[in-house]
């Protein structure tokens, strides 16, 4: 009789983060159920046994069917307003249905399982900005949560549902709070709609790169493949991780002006043209306080618990992203 490998259910498998997690987990001897609204791209060199399932998880019964028999569930689904932004307004019920309601559905589905098997592990993609105004730049996860924006409030609400279910023995749940995740690798299958890749696109089009404020705001930027490795590694450490949130980051922050300048320089190497200008502009009306606070993430706790560390330096990640976009690969993504 063959070995029955664990079943990992990946929710949001065609998204920017989820597709990277799928590629990473596909290298493992596991069974994967890749769940998304549209069919997932199965890596050609996959070692895993992959089931592609299309579903609208907001439909009645869809979540229960998706997570049936799962040993581990990785929840990367997020509500994206329009085509490009995670920002949502107060009282956005459609966003709440996805960002909070799906977690509620997941927990109910697991709680209703027959039998007395071990509770499944659940890894949730949270956000470091859930903390709100911390009063300091370096965060390590011990700060009290006081989220300011609706997106962060909804993320925190979902996380609290998960951790309450962990305390009740329904799941073994952990929230991995992510900083700004960005970039492309040679096998990327989903668009990066964040600021870094947006600036790469602008530079390739010969447009100036608009910089809010004076450019001194620093960000801890995590390459998407490093973020994906964190979730794959988390599968092996559910017992150590469950019951709390964990911060992920590189431990190094970079001024956005320096990031934009480096993008302009790298694109110029491809185009043979002078680097595009980095220009200061007035922030848009939708900008909030978090857009002007520097963040550096101390992820020592997660590194110690899971043995993870980021492997791709910022400059190398930017270069991979520029190369992907300059080759026209991004334009072929759905």
Predicted stretch roles:
Residues 156, 169, 181-197, 212, ...:
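Glycine/proline-rich active-site loop of Rossmann-fold NAD(P)-dependent oxidoreductases
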Residues 148-174, 204:
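Active-site Tyr-X1-5-Lys
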Residues 7, 313-334:
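Amphipathic terminal alpha-helices
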Residues 187-192, 215-228, 244-266, 312, ...:
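Substrate-binding strand-loop-helix patch
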Residues 234-287:
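Mid/C-terminal beta-alpha module of Rossmann-like enzyme folds, strongest
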Residues 8-28:
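N-terminal Rossmann NAD(P)H-binding glycine-rich loop of SDR-like oxidoreductase domains
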Residues 54-98:
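NAD(P)H-binding glycine-rich loop region in Rossmannoid oxidoreductase-like domains
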Residues 104-150:
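Conserved Rossmann-fold NAD(P)-dependent oxidoreductase catalytic core, especially the SDR/UDP-sugar
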């Amino acid at each position: 009789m063959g070995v029955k490998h664990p079943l990992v259910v990946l929710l949001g498998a065609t998204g920017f983060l989820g597709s990277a997690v799928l590629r990473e987990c596909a290298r493992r001897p596991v069974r994967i159920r890749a769940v998304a609204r549209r069919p997932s791209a199965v890596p050609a060199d996959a070692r895993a046994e992959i089931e592609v399932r299309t579903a609208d998880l907001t439909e009645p019964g869809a979540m229960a069917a998706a997570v049936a028999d799962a040993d581990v569930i990785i929840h990367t689904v997020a509500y994206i307003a329009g085509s490009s932004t995670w920002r949502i307004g107060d009282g956005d019920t459609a966003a709440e249905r996805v960002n909070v309601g799906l977690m509620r559905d997941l927990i109910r589905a697991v709680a209703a399982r027959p039998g007395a098997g071990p509770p499944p592990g659940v890894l949730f993609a949270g956000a470091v900005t859930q903390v709100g105004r911390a009063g300091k730049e370096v965060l390590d996860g011990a700060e009290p949560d006081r989220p300011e924006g609706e997106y962060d409030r909804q993320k925190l609400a979902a996380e609290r549902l998960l951790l309450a279910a962990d305390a009740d023995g329904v799941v073994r749940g952990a929230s991995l709070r992510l900083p700004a995740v960005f970039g492309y690798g040679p096998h990327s299958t989903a668009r990066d709609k964040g600021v870094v890749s947006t600036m790469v696109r602008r530079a390739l089009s010969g447009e100036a790169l608009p910089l809010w404020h004076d450019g001194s705001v620093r960000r801890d930027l995590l390459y998407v493949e490093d973020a994906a490795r964190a979730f794959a590694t988390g599968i092996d450490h559910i017992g150590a991780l469950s019951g709390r949130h964990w911060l992920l980051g590189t431990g190094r922050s970079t001024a956005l002006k320096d990031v934009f300048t480096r993008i302009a320089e790298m694109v110029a190497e491809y185009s043979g043209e002078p680097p595009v200008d980095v220009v200061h502009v007035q922030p848009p009306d939708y900008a909030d306080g978090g857009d002007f606070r520097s963040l550096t993430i101390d992820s020592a706790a997660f590194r110690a618990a899971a043995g993870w560390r980021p492997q791709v330096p910022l400059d190398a990640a930017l270069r991979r992203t520029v190369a992907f976009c300059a080759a026209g690969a991004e334009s072929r993504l759905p």
